[in-house]
C-alpha cells in the first residue's frame, strides 16, 4: 500500500525542513516501505506493508 508517514501523534510526518532524500530513507527504515519522497510538506511512502499504519483522512486528529 502507499500513504503518508505519521508521527507519534498520528499527524503527517513533516519533511518541510528535512534534507533531500530524507523521506526515502525514513520510509524504508521506519515503515519498511520500498521508497518514499517529500510530497511537500509531508513524507509519502510506497510499498508499505499492510500491517504498518499510514495517515488516514478519516481518522485524522491533527
From Swiss-Prot:
InterPro entries per the UniProt record, alphabetical: LCN-type_CS_alpha_beta_dom, Scorpion_toxin-like, Scorpion_toxin-like_sf, Scorpion_toxinL, Scorpion_toxinL/defensin
Keyword set, alphabetical order: Amidation, Disulfide bond, Ion channel impairing toxin, Neurotoxin, Secreted, Toxin, Voltage-gated sodium channel impairing toxin
Tissue specificity field: Expressed by the venom gland.
Disulfide bond is among the record's keywords: yes
Chief location of this protein within or outside the cell: secreted
Lineage top rank: taxon: Eukaryota
Disulfides per UniProt: 11-62, 15-38, 23-43, 27-45
PROSITE patterns according to UniProt: LCN_CSAB
Domain named LCN-type CS-alpha/beta: residues: 1-62
Residues with PTM Cysteine amide: 62
A cellular component annotation (GO) from this entry: extracellular region
Compartments where found: Secreted
GO biological process per UniProt: defense response
Molecular-function GO terms, alphabetical: sodium channel inhibitor activity; toxin activity
Entry domain remark: Has the structural arrangement of an alpha-helix connected to antiparallel beta-sheets by disulfide bonds (CS-alpha/beta).
Family the UniProt entry places it in: Belongs to the long (4 C-C) scorpion toxin superfamily. Sodium channel inhibitor family. Beta subfamily.
Function: Alpha toxins bind voltage-independently at site-3 of sodium channels (Nav) and inhibit the inactivation of the activated channels, thereby blocking neuronal transmission. Is toxic to mice.
Name of the protein in its database record: Toxin Tst2
Amino acid at each position: 500500500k502507499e500513504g503518508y508517514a505519521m508521527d507519534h501523534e498520528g499527524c503527517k510526518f513533516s519533511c518541510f525542513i528535512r534534507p533531500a532524500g530524507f523521506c526515502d530513507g525514513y520510509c524504508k527504515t521506519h515503515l519498511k516501505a520500498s521508497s518514499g519522497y517529500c510530497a511537500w510538506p509531508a513524507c509519502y511512502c510506497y510499498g508499505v506493508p499492510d500491517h504498518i499504519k499510514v495517515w488516514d483522512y478519516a481518522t485524522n486528529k491533527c
